[in-house]
């Protein structure tokens, strides 16, 4: 029912195509919000300081995720453009090359998340307990950053191809694994270690690693015209440059928003301390639900327009 062919995108009814493409994307964005709420629930079992630490970490991660956005947006837009131009073999090269470049760049950024958190935490003047947990969360999240970079670039390739159902499947699988692992790794249920807030970050890393592997498996197996060939997995620096050319301007806009969030959180932390940070984080997670439909339609429009 939600199948959309290349011919539908090029010549079909625009409202119908947008709706069919947007439904899985809205569903996956809702699932992502639900996952964040579940994270919040289990971290909340550790106390208000833990919620404040994750809230403090989230804005730092928002900046660290800017390179992920570069390759995800570039992968989606460039794939859509090449598919629309009928350059199917060239389109196949985009997601894999974007994912490979994302892994390289996010690995470097991930090292920064391990090295810099103590310095960054001091800028917000949190309590010692909040700062220590934020450092633990950010250090563990460095693994998630690499997995997310690969998963999002591949997933965005499916979206750019018009196969939003595959993108939903990849994202939903990552979220499901994350949700299952959250209580096990945060609170140490069954045979799992109790890692506290770091467990939430590790659960995210494992979830998105599963998502990346599933996306790769779907691409190897092939879905419609999107399948990996020997030519498509060959490193292609001109394609990577094109991905950067498309993704950098949008990522730059996002970086500006993340810096603004960083300043807001700094003020909240200095003025209201851990309780204020926790309240801000809870409120921002709940408020994110309002943006889900617009995000889904925006992603669908990007796939159509290219």
Residue ranges and their predicted role:
Residues 16-76, 248-270:
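Signature of the first transmembrane helix
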Residues 102, 156-184, 198-205:
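Alpha-helical transmembrane segments of multi-pass membrane transporters/permeases
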Residues 34-52, 121-128, 186-188, 192-195, ...:
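Helix-terminus/linker motif at the lipid-water interface of multi-pass membrane proteins
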Residues 27, 42-43, 54, 79-84, ...:
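Hydrophobic/aromatic residues within transmembrane alpha-helices of membrane transport systems
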Residues 1-22, 79-144, 194-248, 305:
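Short alpha-helical transmembrane segments in multi-pass integral membrane proteins
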Residues 21-29, 62, 102, 141, ...:
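Residue-level signature of transmembrane alpha-helical cores of multipass secondary-active transporters
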């Amino acid at each position: 029912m939600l199948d959309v062919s290349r011919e539908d995108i090029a010549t079909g009814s625009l409202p119908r195509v947008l709706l069919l493409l947007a439904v899985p994307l809205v569903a996956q964005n809702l699932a992502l919000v639900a996952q964040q709420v579940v994270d919040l629930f289990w971290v909340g079992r550790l106390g208000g300081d833990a919620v404040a630490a994750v809230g403090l970490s989230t804005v730092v991660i928002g900046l660290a995720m800017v390179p992920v956005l570069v390759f995800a947006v570039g992968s989606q837009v460039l794939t859509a453009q090449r598919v629309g131009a009928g350059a199917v073999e060239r389109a196949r090269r985009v997601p894999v090359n974007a994912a490979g470049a994302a892994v390289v760049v996010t690995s470097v950024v991930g090292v920064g998340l391990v090295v810099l958190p103590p310095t960054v935490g001091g800028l917000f003047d949190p309590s010692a307990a909040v700062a220590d947990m934020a450092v633990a969360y950010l250090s563990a999240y460095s693994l998630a950053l690499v997995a997310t970079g690969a998963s999002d670039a591949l997933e965005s390739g499916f979206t750019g191809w018009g196969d939003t159902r595959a993108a939903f499947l990849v994202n939903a699988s990552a979220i499901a694994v994350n949700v299952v692992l959250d209580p096990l790794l945060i609170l140490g249920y069954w045979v799992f270690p109790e890692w506290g807030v770091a467990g939430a970050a590790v659960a995210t890393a494992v979830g998105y690693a599963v998502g990346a592997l599933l996306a790769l498996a779907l691409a190897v197996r092939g879905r419609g015209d999107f399948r990996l060939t020997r030519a498509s997995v060959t490193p292609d620096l001109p394609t990577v440059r094109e991905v950067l050319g498309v993704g950098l301007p949008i990522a730059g806009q996002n970086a500006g928003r993340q810096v603004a969030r960083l300043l807001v959180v700094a003020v909240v932390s200095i003025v209201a301390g851990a309780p204020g940070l926790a309240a801000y984080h809870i409120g921002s997670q709940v408020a994110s639900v309002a943006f889900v439909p617009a995000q889904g339609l925006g992603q669908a429009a990007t796939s159509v327009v290219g």
